[in-house]
C-alpha cells in the first residue's frame, strides 16, 4: 500500500485518458457532423477529466432503439389504418400533386415522411392567450379523443388549467392521451401526473431509456408541440404549457410566440406523428380518427416531422431547401441562431441572388452560452449581407419561416444544431398566398419592434465579449 498510495492519482489519470481514448473513437464513429466529431475527439483525448461526463450527457447522436421502435410502430399503425376509411386522404394527396402550387415545394414532399395534402383550413394564432384559448376551447368541445404532446408542462396556473380541463373531459368519457418530455418537464411533480392517471387520463413521458448510458442523456429530446382533437382539429407551433408562455414571468416577459390551428386531411399526419412518439413511450397505439369526408376547397399543407432517427438530416435539409427555394425573400424567426455550414452557405447564396434575407432573433437571452454563440453567427451573417434583427419588447420564441409570397412554415424547430440533429421536431408547411400574407403582416409587426444589427457592431464589441462568443461557438455543435 505504501507503493500504491503515492501513485494512485497517476493510475486514475491514466485510466481517464484510456477511457477518453475509447470515447474519442466512439465520437468519431457516431457524431454526425465533422465539427462535432473533431471537437469531442480532441477534448476527450486531451482533457478527459473535464469532458467524459459531458460526453455521456451531450455526446451521442444516434438513437438506434428509437429507429426500431418507430418501425414497429409503423407496422402497427398500418394495421390500424387498414381498418379506417383512408380513401379521402389518398384523394387529397393526388389533388395536391395535380395543383400548380405543389411544384413550389420542390423537394419537400420527398424530404418529409408525410405527403402534401390539399383542402386544409389554417388559422394563425399569435402569442399565448390566443393559442391556449383556441386549444382549450377545442378540448372543451371534444367528444371522442384528445391527443396532447408538449416538450414542457409546468405545474403552474396554466398547467393546472390544462389539468382541470383534462380531468373534466376524462370524466365525460373522452379518451385523453398526454405525452411530455421527461427532460423538458423535469420539474413536473409526480402528483400532477398521478392525479391525471387516477382519473383515467393516459399519461406517458418520452425518455431515452434504452441502455444504461442513456440514463445520462439529455440529447434526443422530444421538442414537438402537438394537439389533436377528435381527429378533426390540430394545433402545432412553439408554445409549451407554462405561465411564461403567457408572458407572466419577467424578465423575459412579454413572451412572443406563434402557433397554428389546422383542420383537414393534414390532421391525419399530426396523428401519425403523435402515434409514433406515443408508441415509443407506451408500446401501444393511441386512437386514430379520420372523418369520412373532407371539404372540397382549402390550402395545401405538409407536415414535416424530423428527428435523429431519420435517414436524412431532415430538419437541416428543410432549412437549406427553403432558403434555396426563395426567389424574392426568406424571413426566418428563431430564438437561437447556430446554423451549420450548409444552412449558412444557403443564406449567403440567397443574398447573392438578391433575395431579401432577414433573420429575427431575441434581444434578451434565456441561455447565456447559446446567446453568445448566436451573436457571433449573427455578426457573420450581417457581414455576408443578411439583415439580422433583435426583437426588443421581450423574449422571442417563435419558429416561423416565410418564403416569397406563398410558402410559410410554423412549428417547433429552431435554427440550431440541436433542432437539426438532436431533437424531434415538427413544422407545418402551408402553400397559400392569403395565409402567407397573414404571416407577412405578423412578421412586419415584429420587425417594427426590432432593432437591426449594424455591420460595425461586431467591431465595437469588447474583446472579452468576442472571446466569449468564439469560445461559445467552439462548443456550438453540442449546444
UniProtKB/Swiss-Prot annotation:
CDD domains: PLDc_PaCLS_like_2. Belongs to the phospholipase D family. Cardiolipin synthase subfamily. ClsA sub-subfamily. The lineage of its organism: Bacteria, Pseudomonadati, Pseudomonadota, Gammaproteobacteria, Pseudomonadales. Residues 218-245, 392-419 form the PLD phosphodiesterase domain. It is an enzyme of class 2 (transferase). The active site is at residues 223, 225, 230, 397, 399, 404. The keyword RNA-binding does not apply. The chain crosses the membrane at residues 8-28, 38-58. It is a multi-pass membrane protein. It comes from the Bacteria. InterPro entries: Cardiolipin_synthase, CL_synthase_A, CLS_N, PLD-like_dom, PLipase_D/transphosphatidylase. It catalyses: 2 a 1,2-diacyl-sn-glycero-3-phospho-(1'-sn-glycerol) = a cardiolipin + glycerol. GO terms for molecular function: cardiolipin synthase activity. One of its GO terms (cellular component) is plasma membrane. Catalyzes the reversible phosphatidyl group transfer from one phosphatidylglycerol molecule to another to form cardiolipin (CL) (diphosphatidylglycerol) and glycerol. Keywords: Cell inner membrane, Cell membrane, Lipid biosynthesis, Lipid metabolism, Membrane, Phospholipid biosynthesis, Phospholipid metabolism, Repeat, Transferase, Transmembrane, Transmembrane helix. This is Cardiolipin synthase A. Its EC number is 2.7.8.-. GO terms for biological process: cardiolipin biosynthetic process. It is found in: Cell inner membrane. SMART domains: PLDc.
